[in-house]
Design a protein with these regions (language model features):
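Hydrophobic protein-protein interaction segments
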Residues: 103, 107-268
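Short hydrophobic/aromatic-rich motifs at helix boundaries and adjacent loops
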Residues: 8-11, 25-30, 83-85, 94, ...
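Short alpha-helical linear motifs
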Residues: 54, 92-97, 263-264
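Short, charged recognition helix plus adjacent turn
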Residues: 69-103
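Acidic-residue sensor for enzyme active/binding pockets
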Residues: 44, 98, 223
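Short, structured secondary-structure boundary patches
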Residues: 50-51, 62, 87-90, 209, ...
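Basic, Lys/Arg-rich alpha-helical nucleic-acid-recognition elements, primarily the DNA-binding modules
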Residues: 1-81
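Short secondary-structure junction/hinge motifs that connect adjacent elements
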Residues: 31-33, 91, 259-260
Length: 268
């Protein structure tokens, strides 16, 4: 059996919170639902319940009919396969996170962030990886990344802080593309110049993703050479948000950043 998706885990956690709010132990709830204890445990850990089973849980946990809609929507979304699956790409679960997020805050140390990349920059990144990939694999990655960028047009709140170290490999087209994206009302781009000195950003790139599920939450996402990790621990997320705010203060303001990028583009 495959691992549960992020959406399925979110649904399981939401159902667990409802059960606890109703004052029921897992065993008590399982008995009243005519489930065995292990089945309810698996559901709360991300196994997708049947629709009628989920409705029975909402009823048992005292959720009013007028309050059911967000949970039904969560179930419907957890039942879907993401549009990216046919491309057969390795995304470490990030695309499903980004797809559902209402706000993304990204700090990038060495690359232009994916949502701001041109197709030629994307290809250069993938071709530069240690593991050589086929042309088809690269083109699938590019196609998915281009489609991901549609989120910017659909209103995703996006704040990118890009370290100066990420710019030497960016050509004129890429630089102008960043400034074009930054003109959107929902997009904010800041450059963290080398003049800012040593700072927390040297610890590496990271993203913070905010969601509008019942029980608003934030996820910290970090990629590393062996894969990626997403962190939901409240204290770790809080610490990472403070780091992001600090980097934002050190970085050039959005209008100053656009001027800085524009000057760099004029030199290329």
């Amino acid at each position: 059996m495959s691992d549960p998706t992020f959406r399925q885990v979110r649904l399981g956690e939401a159902l667990k919170r409802l059960r606890e709010r109703a004052g029921l132990s897992q065993r008590e709830a399982a008995y009243r639902l005519r489930y065995n204890y292990q089945k309810l445990s698996r559901i709360e850990n991300g196994q997708l319940p049947e629709y009628h089973g989920m409705r029975a849980m909402l009823d048992l946990y005292g959720v009013l009919v007028s309050e059911e809609a967000p949970y039904i929507e969560m179930w419907e979304r957890a039942s879907e396969k993401g549009w990216w699956h046919p491309y057969g790409i390795e995304n470490h679960g990030y695309i499903s996170l980004e797809h559902d997020a209402v706000r993304v805050s990204a700090f990038s140390l060495g690359y232009i962030p994916g949502l701001l990349q041109t197709e030629s920059y994307m290809r250069a990144v993938f071709q530069g990886w240690q593991v050589q990939r086929s042309r088809k694999w690269i083109e699938n990655q590019v196609a998915v990344r281009v489609r991901r960028q549609e989120r910017l047009a659909s209103g995703l709140q996006y704040h990118a802080i890009i370290a100066e170290a990420a710019f030497p490999q960016a050509d004129r087209e890429q630089l102008l593309h960043i400034n074009d994206a930054g003109q959107r009302a929902n997009v904010s781009v800041q450059v963290l110049p080398n003049a800012a000195g040593l700072n927390d950003g040297f610890n590496g790139s990271f993203l913070l993703l905010d969601f509008a599920y019942p029980g608003d939450m934030t996820v910290l996402y970090v990629e590393h050479p062996a894969g990626a990790a997403h962190v939901e621990d409240v204290e770790q997320v809080k610490a990472s948000r403070l780091v992001f705010k600090h980097l934002s203060k050190l970085a050039l303001a959005p209008d100053e950043s656009a001027e800085w990028i524009g000057r760099l583009a004029a030199e290329r």
